[in-house]
Amino acid sequence: RGLGDVYKRQLHVRPGDEVVKKMGGLHKFMVWDKPILTDSGGFQVFSLAGLRKIKEEGVYFHSHVDGRKIFMGPEQSMQIQSNLASTIAMAFDECPSSVADKKYMANSVARTTRWLKRCKDEMARLNSLPDTINPHQMLFGINQGGIYEDIRIAHAQQIAELNLDGYAVGGLAVGESHEEMYRILDAVVPHLPENKPTYLMGVGTPANILEAVDLSLI
């Protein structure tokens, strides 16, 4: 499987998603015939803490490459990923700090849910267009909530109702202990659909991967 990032890998900034689209999408651009997953760029945007402003419509931030002001919201993220023509597109979400207070976390997760619904609507529109390279592009929604079990579980239940192609658990391995991460996974996974793939984002040590597989994640 290939992994591309809408912002960090600079596919939107350089060479530009329109350039990739003109070349036939990422599979032809990379000469790769296996599945490709593209991240939404959300994590990388939110990692630019001093350079971005979060609004209901999306996020305004300054490019780390040339300093220009860029806007990215759910629709823009889906449009970029549609141009890239990946197999799986990740929904645009906010990845708050794991030490964010509970009130902020609850508000952030509620906004992420609203953004997810906008992602789903925009992907349905894009997949119906005649010039879309991959009209079968799949959408994965991302569970957030930091280390707060009740927020995580409620969010998992909400996004499970949207009947997406797959799901992911995000916002982990960002400073919390391994024990806290496993505690959250143990609480959240039972509330995500068993018949859909679930992707644990940003976790990559061998021990972490084995624990995730044991919990039925990929």
Predicted regions and their residues:
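Short secondary-structure boundary/capping segments
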Residues: 27-28, 131, 190
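Active-site-adjacent beta->alpha loops and helix N-cap segments on the catalytic face
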Residues: 11-23, 99-109, 127, 175-188
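Short, small-residue-biased leader/transition segments that mark boundaries at the very start
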Residues: 2-7
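Active-site beta->alpha loop and helix N-cap motifs at the rims of alpha/beta catalytic domains
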Residues: 8-11, 25-125, 143-150
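Flexible, glycine/charged-enriched surface loops at secondary-structure junctions
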Residues: 125-133
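Glycine-rich phosphate/ribose-binding loops and adjacent secondary-structure elements
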Residues: 113, 122, 126, 138-218
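Short, glycine/charged-enriched secondary-structure capping and boundary segments
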Residues: 18-21, 51-53, 104-106, 154-156, ...
